[in-house]
Amino acid sequence: MKRWYVVHAYSGFEKSVAQALRDRISRIEIQDRFGDVLVPAEEVVEMRSGQKRRSEHKFFPGYVLIQIETYYEGGVPRIDNECWHLVKETPKVMGFIGGTADRPLPISSDEADVILRRVQDGAEKPRPKVLFEPGQMVRVIDGPFNDFDGLVEEVNYEKNRLRVAVLIFGRPTPVDLDFGQVQKS
């Protein structure tokens, strides 16, 4: 049975470590003992210079998840030496997280499911980089109310929209705006 293990990699090199692991696994032809290699991340949307930009936000910077064939020895999960050495000797890998240096332990199935669900949700619906709350002051940076300040009244994360009370002629007027049209003031 394959279980998920957490590998500590140099921060900023998670993707290259994941690719190096995939390459090494296929070069040695032991794909049957490995499953997915994953850098848990989600897509976030932010406004920069008036443009909507999509970027990636890693859930666990400096860590890579890898599925490895696991057997049980005295009720304790173990991986074979060849798999251990393949991961441990990959450039920019510092080691496994959990267990001991030479006997890593997998994360629980529940933890793995939560992480995989978050990755799936992030891929299906990019979330805004900045989160808003009712009662918070914001500045409109795009559209007909550009440069107006307002107070957040409602937040709709499903549609990435806000209802903001903007002062127009000295009166608060509710205006519906996209997350990308405002910034925290």
Curated annotation (Swiss-Prot):
Q: Which domain of life is it from?
A: Bacteria
PROSITE patterns to which the protein is assigned, alphabetical: NUSG
Ion transport as UniProt keyword:
no
| HAMAP family reported for this sequence | NusG
Q: What is this protein called?
A: Transcription termination/antitermination protein NusG
What is an annotated GO biological process for this record, any one? transcription antitermination
Question: What is the scientific name of the source organism?
Answer: Xylella fastidiosa (strain Temecula1 / ATCC 700964)
This protein's UniProt keywords: Transcription, Transcription antitermination, Transcription regulation, Transcription termination
Q: Give the residue spans that cross the bilayer.
A: none
The gene behind this protein is nusG
Establish whether keyword Transcription regulation is in the entry.
yes
Domain KOW, by residue range, is 134-162
* Biological role stated in the UniProt entry: Participates in transcription elongation, termination and antitermination.
Instruction: Identify the GO cellular component terms for this protein.
Output: cytosol
